[in-house]
UniProtKB/Swiss-Prot annotation:
Homology family: Belongs to the peptidase A8 family.
Gene Ontology MF term list: aspartic-type endopeptidase activity
Ranges annotated as spanning the membrane: 7-27, 38-58, 68-88, 92-112, 125-145
Catalytic machinery residues: 116, 132
Organism domain of life: Bacteria
Name the UniProt record assigns to this protein: Lipoprotein signal peptidase
Gene this chain is encoded by: lspA
Primary site of residence: membrane
Length: 158
């Protein structure tokens, strides 16, 4: 039996694995609050925890966000298993979002917070993590997919 939406599963696994391995490295290497300038004043690794969503939105809403992460993950898994065969961009987009949602969701359930460490100081951007990056990239891929879909004679998008 061939796995449907294979690229979805590959993207989800890679995103989840890279997120978890980088967070593990940060927790094992840094003290909370410690920073390592890679490009001083521009880009640092800074170990912080976040009880909110991506980029510290909804800070302090851990309980609600852990269930949201689980719900999003279950819906995306159901889509890939029981939905139609998705096009390339949809598979990549949904897969990256699943990997990121699962990565941050595991943190929320196990730790009660998310580990963040990517710190772009040049633009004063909130510290974030690899999962947040994959979720954002996944959304961009879904936008690309939406522009490639054309209406059929019945008015439906293919």
């Amino acid at each position: 039996m061939r796995l449907k939406n294979r690229l979805f599963w590959i993207a989800a696994f890679i995103a989840f694995f890279l997120d978890q391995i980088t967070k593990y490295w940060v927790v094992q290497t840094f003290s909370l609050g410690q920073t390592l300038p890679l490009l001083t004043g521009i880009f640092h690794f800074t170990y912080v925890t976040n009880t909110g969503a991506a980029f510290s939105l909804l800070s302090g809403k851990v309980e609600w966000l852990r269930w949201l992460s689980l719900g999003v993950s279950l819906v995306l898994i159901a889509l890939a298993l029981f939905g139609p065969t998705l096009n390339l961009w949809d598979q990549l987009g949904y897969g990256l979002i699943l990997g990121g949602a699962m990565g941050n969701g595991i943190d929320r359930f196990v730790l009660g917070h998310v580990v963040d460490f990517l710190d772009f100081r040049l633009i004063s951007f909130p510290v974030f993590n690899v999962a947040d990056s994959f979720i954002s990239i996944g959304i961009v891929f879904l936008l690309i997919a939406s522009f490639q879909k054309t209406p059929t004679s019945t008015g439906r998008l293919d």
